[in-house]
Amino acid sequence: MINVEIIKNYSKWREHKQINKALIKKITQKTLSQFDNFSEIKQFELSILLTNNEEILTLNKQFRNIEKATNVLSFPANELNWQDLRFSGNEIASSNKPIILENLGDSDYMHLGDIAFCYDVIYNESYEQQKTFENHFIHLLIHSILHLIGFDHQNDTETKIMENLEIEILAHFGISSPYLLIK
């Protein structure tokens, strides 16, 4: 089960009714199902902030010391490393090591973290990249969840693994690779 708390701090988000708890739960479940490590956890929690340029700028400055609006910020609740994850049924990358859950407390429950999305940046990017707002949001949600569970894109190898996972999950929802449009 996935519990999602959504805070909408910007009225423009209300124009996109299909971006709701049900969609976020479905995307989160599909993303987590890519890894055997999470199959034993019965309950996940995720907090979502849907906001605007002003608030995301403040958050980006406060937490990353970057004075610029961005499309999304991810705040993991746990220090996980993607290299400790066991991939379910794909050959993207694999480890036989169990993920370390002892420091998380109750292994039946996992708070994934918090994600803040900026309407204005996502809207502009989707327009520039000729994508629907919803498809771009879904891609960014998958990308952010991967960050919450320890993925990063600090080098070419990690970037490729992350992008391949995103493409695979997006395809499940009938969404084309976002990287074909921007590369």
Swiss-Prot record:
Name under which the protein is recorded: Endoribonuclease YbeY
Species lineage: Bacteria, Pseudomonadati, Pseudomonadota, Alphaproteobacteria, Rickettsiales
Enzyme class name: hydrolase
Cofactors named for this entry: Zn(2+)
Record-linked InterPro entries: MetalPrtase_cat_dom_sf_prd, YbeY, YbeY_CS
Keyword rRNA processing: yes
Primary location class: cytoplasm
UniProt-annotated location(s): Cytoplasm
PROSITE patterns, A to Z: UPF0054
Family under the similarity heading: Belongs to the endoribonuclease YbeY family.
Keywords: Cytoplasm, Endonuclease, Hydrolase, Metal-binding, Nuclease, Ribosome biogenesis, rRNA processing, Zinc
E.C. number: 3.1.-.-
